[in-house]
Amino acid sequence: MRFADVIGQDILKQRMRHGVQVGRIPHAQLILGSEGSGNMALALAYIQYILCSERSAEDSCGLCGSCKKVSALIHPDVHYTFPFPRKAGEMEQCSDVYPQWREAIKEDTYLNYEDWMQLLNAENKQGNIPTKELRNIIKNVSL
């Protein structure tokens, strides 16, 4: 996903580009917005811009190895965490449903929570991020 593919949000895209260009990328950022606002698309474009080895002042190249890996949602330096309905022995951490998540996000970066739960046949179960997944996050980001 490139910034050019993100609809609107021009001021925010410019701030993100500027931070990368001057070498001031916050160690953590929360990109939050209402459903359908395109924040997942914006986050993916930002990740790709940061990791691109051939970026221009305006956007990632979309062609280098890093861009291709980010676009395929398989870059080893990017970790995704998302809610899912826990099913004992089946789905106990995000990695158990990465293939479905990757396909769903590639198909629709504007995917909402209800549609995601429906794709996983959650029935009446709520999605959550279990303790085991939180421990994995801590392990992955520990220096």
Could you tell me what each predicted segment is?
Residues 2-143:
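Clamp-loader machinery-focused feature within the broader ASCE/P-loop NTPase space
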